[in-house]
Amino acid sequence: WNSKGNIELRFYANSELTLSVPAGKQITSIVFTGKLKSTCNSGALNGLSWTNNDSVINSVTFKASATNNINTITVNYSATQPTEPIAKVNSIKELKALASGTKATLTLTDGNEGSMARVLYVFGTGNTQEAYVRDATGAVCFYGINPNVAFVSNQHLAGQITGEYVVENGVPRFKAIPNVTNTSLLVIAAPVTEQAVQPKEIEAKNYLDNTADWVCLKDQTLINDALTTQDGIVINNRFGSNEKYTAPYQGAIIDLAGIVVPNSERKEINPIYLNNHRPVTFVIDEEKTFVLPQSDITNAAVRLKRTFSADHWDTFAVPFDIEAKDLAGAKIATFTKQVENNTMIFDDKQSQIEAGKPYLIKWNIENPTFEGITLKATTPETVTSNDGQYSFVAVYSPKTLAVDKTERYLSTDESLNYPVSADNKANLLKGLHAYYRVPATATVKISFSSTPNAITRPYMLTDKAMKVYNLNGQYVGSTLSNLPKGVYIVNGHKLIIK
């Protein structure tokens, strides 16, 4: 179109303009001047500038959406670069063995003999979405891949997908290639018979062998406020997890679950809550010093490293309440503060545990975990008898007992013993227990009653001679053996045989 000496190219709505370069060449960019109102069939158009978007293109068509008034068109092109070969791999392990920057077609197979790929976790959307995928051989981050079915945790994947394998800042990624990557040959399906994915338990020394995977590291101690563990693992809540995520504190021992996402040289774990597995579980180990939190921590999970027995009484104390529903099968007793003839009386009809208080317990369980509790900044308590002479003392951490007979422990035969020396830590009481502080010269026993003032038969008896009478005042012998059920007077005290 020539108007007053100005020449312009006009093409109208729904018409097309195709620009091509000679064979063996590729268009790298096109610059227009004037008014351009069109779309393109390949590459990327931004205003008056078009680029090939890193694709090999020797012809591009523009379709007008309205009238176009073009003054000039500058087409930049170069020799076609050799097409890079596309590697073929059959597992994530094989993918991660490639050099960074390699284009590859990843084949994921299903079935018992297949790689059984599963989606672990999805973060973000669109061209920056991170979908962490695990198969039987390893894990990788699918990055910027827009699937035909949205990625969701627990899905299984089978089929083929082409992308570029890169390692960025230590993170292995399988990235989308513009105009190449699609999921048309990839089956993305919800689980049918498969169990929900779970974290892989690893040791910190194997961190770099499990990049992009969902892992669990147990017994990690936080050594500073920067949430760094003794093994150099750093907790970074990059995903912004809020669901059942409780930030730990310096000195805490925790089980940590999350995605292994290195940050250059930093070994980071990005915590996630998934499939009822908490990102942080506090650990209280009877063998290790326990550090109390500065303030109460609500909705926490706590794992105890301790084995209990239903065959004998043992002492127990924890810095959180335990409701009756979480103590199924347990028998619990508290010190009533009553003492009779050096016998400390316990009430064995308790149904729950209060933070900080010392208890006796019978329970058949090992290393129990408690969910949704409040970890309290409550120091261990001491329960002292009414006369002030006998105490039942709770401890969370290992405690060195005195060797002067004033601090005693409960043995598995339910007798109260005192350490005679400190050799080989013979006087070391484990944490999550309680001990007895008593007069050094006293021969102390324990007894149980359903109510504080009830009469009961002691669990421990001395060799002191007995005189046993029935309620009619008749002498019936010097032993309790073979007596029928009933109420008796033994050395001046009422006793019930059931």
Regions found by a protein language model. Give the residues of each.
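A glycine-anchored, Pro-Gly-centered beta-turn/N-cap motif
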Residues: T28, A355-K357, L483-V487
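C-terminal outer-membrane/trafficking sorting elements
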Residues: T336, T451-K498
